[in-house]
């Protein structure tokens, strides 16, 4: 599951659990982005903080793990590089790449997006009522095998990282929106203070 996780919230965890159940996945690997190229319009919390919050949030679920492939690679994070690294580490596994439906819409507009679907199946998770828009998406889906792309609605994705950051900046509670350990980490590190969050548009 790829995402900025800035911060990781309960919607991410519910989405991962739901997808693991629906697709009978042995493991869900959370992959925090290193330097997200599409987020230059706002400050992004340091990668190590986002990585540690993800470790804290997923620690209690034996089906969840966290990978540093994007962080340790350095430079801007691109989905194609993430998939190549995960494939190299898991040559015999059936890979499913879980991402936000909005990010999936962006991926399908890139050049050579077909290469990524040769490495993994894609699962776009979204809040109820979200629809993929755009002629390029319809055309892309028509070219893909039936099992290459799935959309899953997750009610908990009404929670957003943008809202969590804004609440933390305003000293409003984020309890029950993010795991308890992440609440404590954000407070200890004084994250999201003195920031001016922009729009979401991120991988969840």
UniProtKB/Swiss-Prot annotation:
Catalytic activity: nicotinate beta-D-ribonucleotide + ATP + H(+) = deamido-NAD(+) + diphosphate
Domain of life, per lineage: Bacteria
EC class: transferase
Gene Ontology MF, one: ATP binding
EC number: 2.7.7.18
Pathway: Cofactor biosynthesis; NAD(+) biosynthesis; deamido-NAD(+) from nicotinate D-ribonucleotide: step 1/1
Keywords: ATP-binding, NAD, Nucleotide-binding, Nucleotidyltransferase, Pyridine nucleotide biosynthesis, Transferase
InterPro entries: Cyt_trans-like (IPR004821), NadD/NMNAT (IPR005248), Rossmann-like_a/b/a_fold (IPR014729)
GO biological process, one term: NAD biosynthetic process
General function of this protein: Catalyzes the reversible adenylation of nicotinate mononucleotide (NaMN) to nicotinic acid adenine dinucleotide (NaAD).
Entry's family note: Belongs to the NadD family.
PANTHER family assigned: NICOTINATE-NUCLEOTIDE ADENYLYLTRANSFERASE-RELATED, PHOSPHOPANTETHEINE ADENYLYLTRANSFERASE
HAMAP family in the record: NaMN_adenylyltr
Name under which the protein is recorded: Probable nicotinate-nucleotide adenylyltransferase
Species this chain originates from: Mycolicibacterium gilvum (strain PYR-GCK) (Mycobacterium gilvum (strain PYR-GCK))
